[in-house]
Amino acid sequence: MKTIDELLAEGVAGKRVFVRADLNVPLDGTTITDDGRIRAVVPTIAKLAEAGARVVVASHLGRPKGAPDPAFSLAPAATRLGELLGAEVAFAADTVGESARAAVAGLADGRVAVVENLRFNAGETSKDDAERGAFADQLAQLADVYVGDGFGAVHRKHASVFDLPARLPHYAGYLIATEVGVLKKLTTDVHRPYAVVLGGAKVSDKLGVIDHLLERADRILIGGGMAYTFLKAKGYEVGSSLLQEDQIPAVREYLRRAEEKGVEFVLPVDVVVAPSFPDLKTKAPAHPTTVAADAMPAGQMGLDNGPETNKLYASKLADAATVFWNGPMGVFEHPDFADGTRAVAQALVDSSAFSVVGGGDSAAAVRILGFDENAFGHISTGGGASLEYLEGKTLPGLAALED
């Protein structure tokens, strides 16, 4: 995989460099609530601009239906990128149309333009190779060189990620090079004890990575909505908590295999429950109570790890040399259910372990709960991408950069 440093050594002054970034940031209306993904790509864009490139930045945001939708416009992200770069950033109101062509044609050396949301075009995410290829052909007309730096999208076989690099000289940006380097440490040269913390809503999203980690991790700590399927698999009642009944046989098999391989599987011993899911807009009090994990009452929903679990998990992380964490321990967006996620983050801050926060909601939680990002070994920008990398899957966006 050739890197941006090789491109810079060849010289980029006056060249149109297409940067496939990941500006898929959470929005409240037009207000960005977490700009972490934008900040992560700034080093690549800034270095290219400094070297005199004409930088064309493209990204997706959200899941529009292959047509323009103002709710998913990249305009707020383009504005924020300009603030972070300390330079004016042009914004094109379409992706490959008249506005985009004019914005790119008007770029002076060292300037940056952002084109509108890639997913406003059906060809970006099409399952049809020809349709995707046709859109990639249009994108290729905007550039002379391709730099892949949207790690959060490398697991997608999309036109801008997979097809476009085949049409242009291609290089990996700083973010992708860093992300791959960190994840390689977790797969090839891991320092032990190796602890993994998995949370989030659905156990089905994590089965592949659990299967992989049973061969590598020393202990696996489970939290979040997925924990209740594990507790049910152990024979506990879980009230009205999130439950994937169809996954119980798979979970039981993983618990059996973990025991067989000597991998410690750690589940909550107490949980914070409430009668219903909390209101995340008003943050109204949710009337939580703490109960033992094996004594959850009917009609109550588990929404966070309890204080005894938080102490237990902190003790299990204290002596780890390496920690990978993906997924919050509870509904951290509500103050009544944030302590479990906060406790894991604090345990990683207090530990001397090399800690990797695996993107998505856990990365957002670290920032929202006020932790210093530099206190962690690495905060990934790719939730799904980092999980699929750890599963050993071929990621289309990385494979395209290898060729």
Swiss-Prot record:
Q: Could you provide one GO biological process annotation from this protein's UniProt record?
A: gluconeogenesis
Lineage top rank: taxon: Bacteria
Keyword list, A-Z: ATP-binding, Cytoplasm, Glycolysis, Kinase, Nucleotide-binding, Transferase
Q: What class of enzyme is it?
A: transferase
Give the Enzyme Commission number: 2.7.2.3
NADP found in the keyword field: no
Please name the InterPro entries in this protein's record.
Phosphoglycerate_kinase, Phosphoglycerate_kinase_CS, Phosphoglycerate_kinase_N, Phosphoglycerate_kinase_sf
The UniProt entry, under Pfam families, shows: PGK
For this chain, one GO molecular function annotation is: ATP binding
Q: Where in the cell is it found?
A: Cytoplasm
Q: Per the annotation, which location comes first and is thus the protein's main one? A: cytoplasm
> What does the entry list as the binding residues for substrate?
22-24, 37, 60-63, 119, 156
Reaction catalysed by this chain? (2R)-3-phosphoglycerate + ATP = (2R)-3-phospho-glyceroyl phosphate + ADP
Residues involved in ATP binding: 206, 302, 333, 359-362
Q: Where is the signal peptide?
A: none
Metabolic or biological pathway, per its Swiss-Prot or TrEMBL entry: Carbohydrate degradation; glycolysis; pyruvate from D-glyceraldehyde 3-phosphate: step 2/5
A GO-annotated cellular component: cytosol
Complexes and interactors: Monomer.
The record's listing under HAMAP family reads: Phosphoglyc_kinase
Q: What is this protein called?
A: Phosphoglycerate kinase
* Origin species: Streptomyces griseus subsp. griseus (strain JCM 4626 / CBS 651.72 / NBRC 13350 / KCC S-0626 / ISP 5235)
Origin organism lineage: Bacteria, Bacillati, Actinomycetota, Actinomycetes, Kitasatosporales
